[in-house]
């Protein structure tokens, strides 16, 4: 992993394609915490830790293949957050990417870590020529407020898009943000 420090001693590093098993397990613990905290990120509660480990193992394979970049925030020896960017493989869409799975441990929210992870992903995407990022997030969620404050543009809402961790169908909001060369043009 390569690192960039946000505020207050937390270090954000890019995940490589062969992390130690202990890191995959810590990332799984973060995923379980995020789901059990009510975030709608594709999983239902209770999320089994083994399923979370398996999901992260798949993400590591995607990182190794080059279709996904992941940044991990650590505070000392604890994993406290993560964010990913999925890169399309089609020739007509290589200018854009999708921001995915922004997670901050419940004990570490409200300290600017989500904003630091988001800024890291935006900057890194722009550095490799991405000019447009997009995402979807549960409408009305704390994450949506973060994206609004960070200058993302909401383009619409899809009703009953995905179930929250408790199985209730919730709407999602679609957002985009121009980055890199598109911002300075």
Q: What annotation goes with each model-predicted range?
A:
Residues 68, 170-174:
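Short hydrophobic/aromatic beta-strand or adjacent loop that forms the aromatic wall/cage
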Residues 147-148, 152:
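Conserved active-site tyrosine of GNAT-family acetyltransferases
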Residues 134-136, 153-171:
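Conserved catalytic-core motifs of GNAT/GCN5-like acyltransferases
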Residues 10-101, 105, 118-120, 124, ...:
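Acetyl-CoA-dependent GNAT
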């Amino acid at each position: 992993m390569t690192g960039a420090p946000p505020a207050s001693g937390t270090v954000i590093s890019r995940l490589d394609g062969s992390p130690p098993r202990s890191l995959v397990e810590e990332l799984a613990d973060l995923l379980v915490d995020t789901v059990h905290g009510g975030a709608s990120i594709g999983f239902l509660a209770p999320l089994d830790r083994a399923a979370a480990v398996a999901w992260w193992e798949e993400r590591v394979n995607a990182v190794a293949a080059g279709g996904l970049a992941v940044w991990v925030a650590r505070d000392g020896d604890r994993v406290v957050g993560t964010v990913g960017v999925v890169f399309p493989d089609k020739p007509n869409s290589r200018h854009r990417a999708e921001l995915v799975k922004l997670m901050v441990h419940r004990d570490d929210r409200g300290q600017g870590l989500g904003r630091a992870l988001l800024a890291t992903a935006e900057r890194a995407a722009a550095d490799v020529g991405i000019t447009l990022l997009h995402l979807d997030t549960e409408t009305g969620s704390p994450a949506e407020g973060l994206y609004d404050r960070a200058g993302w543009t909401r383009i619409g809402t899809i009703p009953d898009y995905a179930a929250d961790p408790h199985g209730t169908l919730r709407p999602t909001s679609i957002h985009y943000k121009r980055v890199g060369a598109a911002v300075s043009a």
